[in-house]
Design a protein with these regions (language model features):
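Acidic, small-polar-rich N-terminal luminal/periplasmic segments of exported/outer-membrane proteins
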Residues: 72, 86-89, 132-280, 629
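Acidic/polar loop-and-plug regions of large Gram-negative outer-membrane beta-barrel proteins
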Residues: 320-324, 337-405, 418-450, 495-521, ...
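Structural signature of Gram-negative outer-membrane beta-barrels, strongest in the C-terminal barrel
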Residues: 341, 450, 469-481, 523-649, ...
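Gram-negative outer-membrane beta-barrel transporters
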Residues: 541-542, 646-648, 666-752, 817-819
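Conserved C-terminal beta-signal and adjacent last beta-strands/turns
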Residues: 595, 627, 714-820
Length: 820
């Protein structure tokens, strides 16, 4: 008989349970066989391991820690009901972990014999206390901070609020783990976020970057946070080899994270958590192949060392290259990521350094439909770009973070980092005028350099005022950025004839106009973003009612210069206050109702550098507002969420008037997105894991110039998005699993006038994996096929720039991972 480890421990009210009551619902360790390796007293082990236990009642946190570390523990719930814990983040031995959690609480860990322990008040010698035989299951999975199956984490980092349990925050949050990344062979951040029905991906403007839409609003890759800091990650494409967790926050987040550098992310934000050295040494080598001839490898090494394993190092090296599944397209990528950390009794320090380089030759271009109809997509493998087109993206970045426990209730933190970006490339977008594919090929050469610095500092703590608990957060943040750009291009009249369905190669065009010096790009933008935030989460009725209130004061200083002339095109210095209100009600152990009212604030958008009448024009800051309500369900092994929301934000679009060849980019009116979301994740049945969801969205434009587009739907926003992803363990074949995923996305308008649109599409993916042990090494074989039917479809329309991105063709991915 097999007993599943308990994954959730509810908090109990002292009014319902007497002194000798069991502190938590638990499974007896004696019910299941215990390997001999675990028979020794785990408290005597000097090995350290990483923990990510969210803040909560001290009893709950102790129970989770004991279960993960394998310590049979008994204690009296009534003694701990009034004590709050900040949780446990980082690497600890079992002894140092208990010492950290119990420090200042007035309680000690006592042996009960036979490797069992209890928690009792500090008493004089000779005093005694009667305890019943309560235990915490010491055989609990090390992944207790995830739902069953390990695909989704129970906690996430939420900006100034810190690491929080998802069910205890009044927002819609999901966090995908490194296990999800590995099993799906997700090479980029876009591959990971595709698991959520609220997110879809498109190509960026011209240079093959990844752009996401969350709740129907864009998120640029350079507006993604790294351990809570903006401006440090690679600007266009983020690879996943060094990623431990991807935290997705849905909705405006000006209070949570502050203003994003480029002004996107109103519909949601993403935070990347890097890998750290674990208590068990990491020795992993992966070799992989993807169609057509892309091969690569990934080496992941981690080790803790020093006294009590206080020092840690994690190194990830990866390289891939070859032809993709798109005809004549080749890609090469390199990654070096080094993470170092130190964990003392009170002080924790971590550093992260990375270098990433991406090279794309003849990457399939975006398509601009500039006629009265939208052409049907060509074959899924077709490439209509020019053989002289290419893009190279190179990023070097680093970050240092430190935390110090001032006492048992307050922790101070500080962090800072910097990044240098160098981008270059020649691009050949296609402008299609009719359903026969009649087109013209454009040309753009655009080097771009960028330097960012980012810093954060704050104080987190907790205290009680009578029966009310408080979780206080104070934070300061700042980001300083400088952008340098230049370009060479051809006039509209000089674009060369071509065809979407029968593309021809043309010589590289002669430049007809340019901006700045391509060998020494001039400064085109500077931004300085500073903010201060304070919040308090008040807990009532044994923390079953949680009220979050907060405010962030933000200052945006932006300067911009025209790339061609060098003339100043923007100069503003504005300060804006953004509040947040949130409520969580937990009437039952497995149910949380939540509601929030939160705002978004973003640096105003910048018009594209070409193909508009106002290139590089910078607009003032935009404020958006969201109201949201929903319910979260947690059944230990799996969870589900249901929510409704309304987002109001100023709308930006490129308007093309009849008879004009170039449109004008402007902030024109207001866009309202109303949506309904449903998600389920975890393992509802033994051996069956789900990542499923559905999103329904209604958008409407209002207050537009002269009412020209009032009542229309916003461009690039589907009416619905469905996801169904499953993994099934094959009975009788240990370590083997099959997987499948269906993605369904509704039709979208391409322009604000709603005269051009693309239809709905469906994509099916299949996969399998098999893990086994050979010669004391664990080997995992994986195979995935994306877009099994090789369906040709327009995957997305830009939300602002009127271009289309075609979906990827059928792609086979296989890999072999050896843990040694």
């Amino acid at each position: 008989m097999t007993f599943r480890p308990l994954q959730h421990v509810p908090r109990m009210s002292p009014t319902r349970f007497p002194l000798k009551a069991l502190s938590l619902a638990i499974a007896l360790t004696g019910l299941a066989p215990v390997p001999s390796a675990l028979a020794a007293d785990p408290l005597q082990s000097s090995a350290a391991r990483s923990y990510a236990i969210a803040p909560g009642p001290l009893g709950d946190v102790l129970a989770q820690f004991a279960a993960i570390s394998g310590v049979p523990l008994s204690f009296d719930s009534k003694l701990l009901n009034d004590h709050h814990s900040d949780g446990l983040q980082g690497s600890y031995t079992v002894q140092s972990g208990f010492a950290h959690l119990l420090q200042g609480s007035g309680y000690s860990l006592l042996s009960t014999g036979e490797n069992g322990y209890t928690v009792a008040p500090d008493v004089k010698v000779g005093d005694a206390m009667e305890l019943s035989a309560t235990t915490v299951n010491g055989d609990m999975s090390a992944q207790s901070d995830t739902y069953a199956g390990g695909q989704v984490a129970r906690s996430a980092r939420l900006g100034v609020l810190g690491n929080r349990d998802i069910k205890d925050v009044p927002f819609s949050v999901v966090s995908y783990t490194s296990k999800t990344i590995a099993d799906q062979q997700a090479r980029t951040l876009g591959d990971v976020l595709l698991n959520d029905a609220s997110v879809r991906q498109s190509a960026g403007f011209g240079n093959f970057s990844q752009v996401f839409t969350i709740r129907g609003l864009p998120l640029q890759t350079d507006d993604i946070a790294f351990n809570g800091l903006y401006g440090l990650l690679p600007r266009q494409i983020i690879t996943t080899e060094a990623v431990e967790r991807v935290d997705l926050f849905k909705g405006p987040n000006a209070f949570i994270n502050g203003v994003s550098p480029q002004g996107s992310g109103i519909g949601g934000s993403v935070n990347i958590v890097p890998k750290r050295a674990d208590d068990t040494p990491t020795r992993s080598m992966t070799l992989d192949y993807a169609s057509d001839t892309t091969v690569g490898g990934h080496l992941d090494l981690g080790q803790r060392f020093g006294e009590d394993n206080r020092f840690g190092a994690r190194i990830n090296l990866a390289q891939h290259g070859g032809e993709t599944a798109i005809d004549d397209e080749t890609k090469r990528s390199q990654l070096i990521a080094v993470a170092l950390d130190y964990h003392g009794d009170r002080l924790r320090i971590s550093t992260d350094f990375g270098y990433q380089k991406e090279r794309i030759n003849q990457g399939r271009a975006v398509v601009y439909p500039n006629g009265s109809v939208v052409p049907h997509p060509p074959s899924a493998k077709d490439n209509y770009s020019q053989d002289w087109s290419w893009s190279q993206l190179e990023d070097t970045y680093g970050m240092v973070n430190a935390e110090y426990d001032l006492n048992d209730h307050w922790t101070a933190y500080v962090g800072g980092g910097a990044k240098h970006t160098r981008e270059n490339g020649e691009y050949s977008s296609l402008y299609v005028s009719d359903k026969s594919g009649t087109a013209k090929t454009g040309f753009l050469y655009s080097p771009h350099d960028e330097d960012n610095k980012s810093a954060v500092a704050g104080l987190n703590g907790h205290f009680d005022t009578g029966p009310v608990t408080h979780q206080m957060n104070f934070g300061l943040s700042g980001m300083w950025g400088e952008q340098r750009s230049a370009y060479e291009a051809i006039l509209v009249a000089n674009r060369q004839p071509n065809n979407l369905y029968n593309p021809v190669q043309i010589p590289r065009p002669s430049v007809t106009y340019f901006g700045s010096d391509i060998h020494d790009p001039r400064i085109v933008g500077k931004n300085r973003i500073k903010s201060a935030a304070v919040s308090d989460t008040l807990g009532f009725v044994d923390d079953r009612v949680l009220l979050t209130v907060g405010v962030r004061r933000q200052t945006l200083e932006v300067d911009a210069w025209n790339t061609a002339s060098g003339a100043r095109s923007a100069n503003y210095d504005e300060s804006i206050t953004t509040p947040v209100y949130g409520l969580v009600l937990k009437p039952w152990d497995h149910v949380s109702f939540y509601a929030n009212r939160i705002e978004g604030l973003a640096q105003g958008p910048t018009a594209p550098a070409t193909n508009v009448t106002n290139p590089n024009e910078v607009f003032p800051p935009r404020r958006s507002k969201q109201t949201e309500a929903g319910v979260k369900l947690d059944w230990d092994d799996y969870g589900a969420t249901f929510g409704v929301y309304r987002i109001e934000q100023p709308n930006s679009a490129t308007t093309l008037l009849p008879g004009n060849r170039l449109g004008t980019f402007n902030v024109d009116g207001e866009q309202v997105n109303k949506g309904l979301e449903m998600n389920i994740f975890g393992e509802p049945l033994d051996g069956l894991r789900l990542l499923a969801g559905a999103t329904f969205m209604h958008t409407e434009l209002s207050k537009t110039s002269n009412g020209l587009t009032d009542g229309n739907r916003a461009a690039g926003v589907p009416r619905f998005q469905y996801n169904l992803s499953t993994q099934w363990d094959i009975p009788g074949l240990e370590g083997a699993a099959l997987s499948g995923r269906i993605l369904r996305t509704g039709g979208e308008y391409i322009n604000a006038e709603n005269t051009l649109s693309i239809p709905a599409w469906t994509r099916v993916d299949l996969g399998a994996r098999y893990g086994f042990k050979a010669d004391d090494k664990y080997i995992t074989l994986r195979a995935n096929v994306e877009n099994v039917a090789n369906k040709a479809y327009w995957a997305s329309a830009s939300t602002a720039n009127n271009y289309l991105t075609q979906g990827e063709p059928r792609t086979l991915k296989v890999s072999a991972t050896v843990d040694f």
